[in-house]
């Protein structure tokens, strides 16, 4: 009986994914879409211009940026594409 109860608890934890993680896009500029699993609860998309043109950086979290860099932070899976 104890074994059955323990098995049910383990299955419940695995199915509920109590350690919820976020999936964020992490490709740079116009590269093909790639994603990563993050421990943070948000994703970001940084955009700026330099001599190469418009540069886009994507990743996990919501970093501080320097003036002149556009930052968009969001809180749903793959929201920074």
From Swiss-Prot:
UniProt keyword annotation of Kinase present: no
What are the entry keywords?
A: Acetylcholine receptor inhibiting toxin, Disulfide bond, Ion channel impairing toxin, Neurotoxin, Postsynaptic neurotoxin, Secreted, Signal, Toxin
Disulfide connectivity for this sequence is: 24-43, 38-60, 62-73, 74-79
Q: Which PROSITE patterns match?
A: SNAKE_TOXIN (PS00272)
Question: Where would you say this protein principally sits, based on its record?
Answer: secreted
**Cellular location(s):** Secreted
Q: What InterPro entries does the record point to?
A: Snake_3FTx, Snake_toxin-like_sf, Snake_toxin_con_site, Toxin_cobra-type
Q: In which tissues is it expressed?
A: Expressed by the venom gland.
Looking up SUPFAM superfamilies in the UniProt record yields:
Snake toxin-like
Gene3D superfamilies of this UniProt entry? Answer: CD59 (2.10.60.10)
GO cellular component terms given for this protein = extracellular region
UniProt keyword Secreted present: yes
Q: In this record, what's one Pfam family?
A: Toxin_cobra-type
Signal peptide position in this chain? Answer: 1-21
Under Gene Ontology molecular function, one entry of this record is: ion channel regulator activity
Entry similarity comment: Belongs to the three-finger toxin family. Short-chain subfamily. Type I alpha-neurotoxin sub-subfamily.
Q: What does this protein do?
A: Binds to muscle nicotinic acetylcholine receptor (nAChR) and inhibit acetylcholine from binding to the receptor, thereby impairing neuromuscular transmission.
Name assigned to this protein: Short neurotoxin 1
* Organism the protein comes from: Austrelaps superbus (Lowland copperhead snake)
């Amino acid at each position: 009986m104890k074994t059955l109860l323990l098995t049910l608890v383990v299955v419940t934890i695995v199915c509920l994914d109590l350690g919820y993680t976020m999936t964020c896009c992490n490709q740079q500029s116009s590269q093909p879409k790639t994603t990563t699993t993050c421990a943070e609860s948000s994703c970001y998309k940084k955009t700026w211009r330099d001599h190469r043109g418009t540069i886009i950086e994507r990743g996990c979290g919501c970093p501080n940026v320097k003036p002149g860099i556009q930052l968009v932070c969001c809180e749903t899976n793959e929201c920074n594409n």
